[in-house]
Amino acid sequence: MAKRGKKYLEAVKLIDRDQAYQVEEALELVKKASVAKFDETVEVAVRLGVDPKKADQQIRGAVVLPNGTGKTQRVLVFAKGEKAKEAEAAGADYVGDEDCINKISQGWFDFDVIVATPDMMAQVGKLGRVLGPKGLMPNPKTGTVTFEVEKAVNDIKAGKVEYRVDKAGNIHVPIGKVSFDTAKLAENFETIIDTLVKAKPAAAKGTYLKNIAVSSTMGPGVKVSTASFGK
C-alpha cells in the first residue's frame, strides 16, 4: 500500500469515520480534506439495496446537474444530413459518420461522450469492443441514442452525468469540484440522490439507500446520513 503523505493524514484527523454527517457538513469536510495541488473532483458513492444480477433491478440513467460538474465535456455526434447540421449548431465538438468510425477504430479517442442518432447505431455498434470497455457506447437509457441531438448536446454541455449500478450494487457519480460553493455541491448531491430514489426498482426489498459517502479525487471518504432521504 502506498504511503500516505502528511497532509493526507492531517486531513483524515478532521473526519470521524464512524459518524454519518449531514450533507453540507460532509461536503465541507471533503473540501477541507482536499490536499492535492489541482482542483479535485467531488464524487458521491451510493451503496444500494439491489441485486444487480437480476434484470429488474438494473439501475442506469442520466441526469443534468443544476450546477454542472466543472468539467467541459467533448461531445462526438454520429449523425447525417440535417441532424448533423443540428448537432454542429448545438455546439458538438465533433460530428461525423463513417469517417469518425474509422478514426476510432484506429485509436482516436479525443472526446468524452458519444451521441448517435438511431439510424447510425448499426455502424456505431461495430465499435462495441472498443467503446464498451471505456463506457463510451451510446445508450437510449442515458439519452445518447436519440434523434433529439440538439437537446442531447445541450444537456451534456450543461452538466449531464450518467449513473449505473455496478456488480456490487454501488453507484459512483461526480458532483462537481472542490472549488464549488458547498451549497452548489449540496444541490448537485441532492439531485443525484433524488434521482436514484425515484429510480428504485419495484422488486428491490429492504433498505434501498444502504450507505452514502462523498470524497474528493485524492481525499478520504466522508459518510453522509441517509435519514433525510427516502429509503
UniProtKB/Swiss-Prot annotation:
The keyword rRNA-binding appears for this protein: yes
Keyword Transport among record annotations: no
Keywords assigned: Repressor, Ribonucleoprotein, Ribosomal protein, RNA-binding, rRNA-binding, Translation regulation, tRNA-binding
CDD domains registered for this protein in UniProt: Ribosomal_L1
GO biological process: regulation of translation; translation
Alphabetized GO MF terms: rRNA binding; structural constituent of ribosome; tRNA binding
Short name of any one Pfam family annotated for the protein: Ribosomal_L1
SUPFAM superfamilies per UniProt: Ribosomal protein L1
One GO cellular component, as annotated: large ribosomal subunit
Recorded family membership: Belongs to the universal ribosomal protein uL1 family.
HAMAP family linked to this entry: Ribosomal_uL1_B
Subunit structure: Part of the 50S ribosomal subunit.
Entry function: Binds directly to 23S rRNA. The L1 stalk is quite mobile in the ribosome, and is involved in E site tRNA release. Protein L1 is also a translational repressor protein, it controls the translation of the L11 operon by binding to its mRNA.
Protein name: Large ribosomal subunit protein uL1
Designated gene of the protein: rplA
